[in-house]
Structures are given as C-alpha cells and as structure tokens.
Amino acid sequence: DCASGPCCRDCKFLEEGTICNMARGDDMDDYCNGKTCDCPRNPHKWPAP
C-alpha cells in the first residue's frame, strides 16, 4: 500500500485512528485515516481557557 511516511509501517497503511502526531500547545492530536501514508492535519484546536 505504501513505502514510507508517518502512517505507513511494513508497507501497509496504519489503522484509522492511530495517532501520528502528538498534540502541542493548543493543537489536538493528528490521526492516520487508514487510506494514506501522510499524517492528515487535525483542523481542530483546544478551546481557549
């Protein structure tokens, strides 16, 4: 399925919902979608305090 990338392991796409980028600051975690080797950016942010 894939050769390399944050959502690729052993030439297979990682399962949908696998965290591929941990949250930093007000960002939320990014998750693999099970269809691409890239790590899709989560557009959502944590609400301001």
From Swiss-Prot:
Residues 1-47 form the Disintegrin domain. Inhibits ADP-induced human platelet aggregation. A motif (Cell attachment site) lies at residues 24-26. Belongs to the venom metalloproteinase (M12B) family. P-II subfamily. P-IIa sub-subfamily. Its main location: secreted. This is Disintegrin pyramidin-B. The disintegrin belongs to the short disintegrin subfamily. One of its GO terms (cellular component) is extracellular region. It is found in: Secreted. Keywords: Cell adhesion impairing toxin, Disulfide bond, Hemostasis impairing toxin, Platelet aggregation inhibiting toxin, Secreted, Toxin. Expressed by the venom gland. Disulfide bonds join 2-11, 7-32, 8-37, 20-39. Monomer (disintegrin). The lineage of its organism: Eukaryota, Metazoa, Chordata, Craniata, Vertebrata. GO terms for molecular function: toxin activity. The keyword 4Fe-4S does not apply.
